[in-house]
Regions:
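Basic, helix-initiating cap at the start of DNA-binding domains
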Residues: 1-37, 54
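Amphipathic alpha-helical segments enriched in hydrophobic/aromatic and basic residues
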Residues: 22, 30-31, 42, 52, ...
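Helix-turn-helix/winged-helix DNA-binding modules
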Residues: 26-27, 47, 137
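Short hydrophobic/aromatic patch on the recognition helix
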Residues: 39-49
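Hydrophobic alpha-helical connector segments
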Residues: 58, 65-97, 107-122
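Amphipathic alpha-helical packing segments from all-alpha helical-bundle domains
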Residues: 86, 107-158, 169-178
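Short linear capping/connector segments at secondary-structure termini
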Residues: 101-110, 199-202
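C-terminal peripheral helix-coil segments that are non-catalytic and often amphipathic
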Residues: 117, 121, 125-133, 161-212
Length: 212
């Protein structure tokens, strides 16, 4: 294996480990725990990322790239509902809930802000298109969707089974999670019976926790 290939493999392992440790330990995830889970030395981590914050910032950039790609794929679907549903399902799998603990604890870089803005614009376009087509309930906003996705991306059952090493139950838990997601999606349809309580959440409610 060439040095370049080994470096790429180590980086992939570090990013995967960082996501996993972050999901369990939150923003207090230690560099040592991340390196150990990745099976590399701490020196390898610091050769790639000068600080833990830089590693977490890179994770956020990668996730924002994934959200933008999912939204653009949704917009490419001519069916307003299916396009929106594709974005929601894909965003849930990306797992924004695991990055939420970083809010307010790391500096938002210009790259993060730019990618977030582009992603927000694409998702807003999905929501507006679905509203115009009459397939998305009129009282659902882009912020509602962002908060819903963050909640659905968390799976305490899957996390617990993973910690217990219950590989025999993981697939059933994934199927159960897919059912819950489908129930939530149906609740977004314009045919939903009951109005939502309270006022729509502001964009600041969702975004200001990232300010330091």
């Amino acid at each position: 294996m060439t040095r370049k290939a080994e470096a790429e493999r180590n980086d992939e392992a570090l990013l995967r480990a960082a996501r996993e440790v972050l999901a369990v330990d939150g923003a207090h995830a230690s560099v040592a725990a991340i390196a150990a889970r990745a099976g590399v030395g701490i020196g390898s981590l610091y050769r790639r990322y000068r600080t833990k914050e830089e590693l977490f910032q890179h994770l956020c950039v990668l996730a924002l790239d994934d959200y933008l790609r999912a939204a653009e794929e949704g917009l490419a679907d001519e069916d307003p509902w299916e396009g929106l549903a594709h974005y929601i399902r894909t965003a849930i799998e990306i797992g924004p809930g695991s990055l939420a603990p970083l809010a307010g604890l790391i500096e938002v870089t210009d790259e993060m802000a730019d990618k977030n803005s582009r992603s927000d614009e694409a998702v807003t376009a999905l929501v507006e298109r679905a509203h115009r087509a009459g397939v998305l309930r009129a009282d659902v906003t882009m912020v509602d969707l962002a908060l819903l996705i963050e909640q659905l991306a968390k799976s305490p059952l899957l996390d617990q089974l993973g910690r217990q090493g219950r590989a025999d139950l993981v697939e059933s838990a994934r199927e159960a999670r897919a059912r819950i997601n489908a129930i939530a999606l149906d609740g977004l349809r314009a045919t939903a019976a009951h109005p939502l309580p309270g006022e729509p959440p502001s964009y600041e409610l969702f975004s200001e926790r990232w300010e330091r």
